[in-house]
From Swiss-Prot:
Region Disordered, annotated ranges: 73-94
Organism of provenance: Dictyostelium discoideum
Alphabetic keyword roster: Kinase, Transferase
InterPro entries the record matches: Actin-fragmin_kin_cat_dom (IPR015275), Kinase-like_dom_sf (IPR011009), PI3/4_kinase_cat_sf (IPR036940), Put_AFK (IPR037469)
Pfam families: Act-Frag_cataly
One example of a Gene Ontology biological process annotation: sexual reproduction
Tree of life domain: Eukaryota
Entry protein name: Putative actin-fragmin kinase DDB_G0279609
Family stated for the protein in its record: Belongs to the protein kinase superfamily. AFK Ser/Thr protein kinase family.
Molecular function terms, GO-annotated: kinase activity
Keyword Transferase: yes
Cited PANTHER family: ACTIN-FRAGMIN KINASE DDB_G0279609-RELATED
Keyword Transferase assigned: yes
């Protein structure tokens, strides 16, 4: 059953209930391309309204997202293994019929005591999510994704930028260990996992030490790249649009130096399109994919650093080839396509490469039109004051310090150069 939200037409954003010291990445109710930040006390809401000219100077930031579609929510291979047992709880004892099971994904007002199962979801490139399933007294199942990381700050920063660009990211919020809800979450996760899976229990115990968790919306029926029927998926209905959308994602990855997805600019990348879920049915904004995790990896901000110069040079090279001959497959795209074809024993034609190439061009144009140096700087400043208490290892501060704005600024200038 789809999650239903009611919006007021005259408001840009949903009214958000106070959730102390949380970060929420929320859907915008207005498709306006203008962007501005508004305050929500003790929260960071990710909305599609960011002001390029001036982001308000306070301790909160609002950024947006285009959440994945929850259409046709059914059990899939990623669902928990004991759903069949849970279904039996819905059996009507009087007539032996089953009460229809209702599934949804709501990251707010979670009753952690209603947790009935937790399992792992591996999206590649060492990114592990937890699928938490809750059962309320109305026989409704709520499923959310949980994720912690040693690079949580960089991931939140990337999600903010994705939201500004209206890329397809799930609704999410940040939960820090100083919040009482973190204790409730920890207790429930450890209690459930200790009864079913010792290795999972040990894994969760270690993850909880990282002090910050993302609670994310979960839309079932998504597939990882390696699980796709490539010929049917990319040559069938909407095939060209899907490839074009991948290109837009690649453009963002180039800007953020996010090497987790494919070997286009980066050396020795073993994964292809990791951290992306692919759907047969597009969401309400027309996206067939959902970006489950992104990162910003800034090279040292000295222009004299070898790695710094090498990366900027590679970006210039690929952008020059793409913008000079957009309808002819570049050598870089061809190399990427052949690498994917070899790894998965599939035949992606040069026309597929050109579709991806055109998507990259569109993505670059989008970045130039919606991202500015002031937004990059102000977003970092907002995140600096987001959490109430940093971890004992100062993970939040260290993450922020690793986001070198001169590097991102140079990449933005490089893209403008070829636009």
């Amino acid at each position: 059953m789809n999650k239903i939200k009611v919006f007021k037409k005259n408001f840009f954003f949903e009214k958000i209930k106070n959730k102390k010291n949380n970060i929420e990445i929320k859907k915008s109710t207005n498709d306006s391309t203008s962007n501005t930040c508004t305050d929500i006390k003790n929260n960071i809401i990710i909305e599609n309204k960011i002001n390029e000219e001036n982001i308000e100077n306070n301790n909160n930031i609002n950024i947006g997202n285009n959440s994945v579609n929850n259409n046709n929510i059914n059990n899939n291979n990623n669902s928990i293994n004991n759903n069949n047992n849970n279904n039996n709880k819905n059996k009507n004892k009087n007539n032996n019929s089953y009460i229809p099971m209702i599934q949804y994904s709501n990251i707010h007002c979670i009753d952690w005591s209603s947790l009935i199962s937790v399992d792992k979801l591996d999206l590649g490139s060492s990114n592990i999510f937890l699928i938490a399933t809750f059962l309320n007294n109305k026989c409704e199942y709520n499923q959310v994704l949980l994720k912690s990381s040693t690079t949580i700050v960089q991931e939140v920063y990337a999600s903010v930028l994705e939201s500004i660009l209206k890329l397809p990211i799930p609704e999410m919020r940040l939960l820090e260990y100083s919040n009482d809800e973190y204790i409730q979450m920890s207790r429930s996760l450890l209690t459930i996992s200790s009864k079913t899976n010792k290795s999972l229990y040990d894994y969760i115990k270690l993850e909880l030490l990282k002090s910050f968790f993302l609670i994310m919306e979960y839309a079932p029926n998504g597939k990882s790249f390696k699980d796709l029927d490539y010929k049917e998926y990319f040559s069938g209905y909407g095939g060209e649009k899907k490839l074009n959308q991948l290109g837009q994602v690649i453009a963002f990855d180039i800007f953020c130096n996010n090497s987790d997805r494919l070997p286009l600019i980066w050396d020795n990348v073993s994964s292809h399109f990791s951290n992306i879920l692919f759907y047969d049915i597009p969401n309400r904004n027309g996206w067939y994919i959902s970006l489950m995790n992104s990162n910003v990896t800034c090279i040292n901000n000295s222009s004299f650093t070898i790695g710094y110069r090498k990366y900027i040079t590679r970006v210039k090279s690929i952008l020059y080839a793409l913008f000079k001959r957009p309808n002819i497959e570049s050598n870089q795209i061809k190399k990427m396509r052949e690498s994917i074809s070899k790894s998965y024993k599939i035949n992606l034609s040069s026309s597929c490469g050109i579709s991806i190439q055109r998507g990259i061009i569109q993505g670059v144009q989008l970045i130039i039109s919606r991202i500015s140096i002031s937004i990059l700087s102000d977003t970092k400043e907002k995140l600096r004051h987001l959490v109430k208490v940093d971890s004992t290892t100062n993970a939040w501060k260290k993450g922020l310090d690793s986001i070198h704005l001169p590097f991102l600024s140079d990449l933005l200038d490089t893209m403008v150069l070829f636009y």
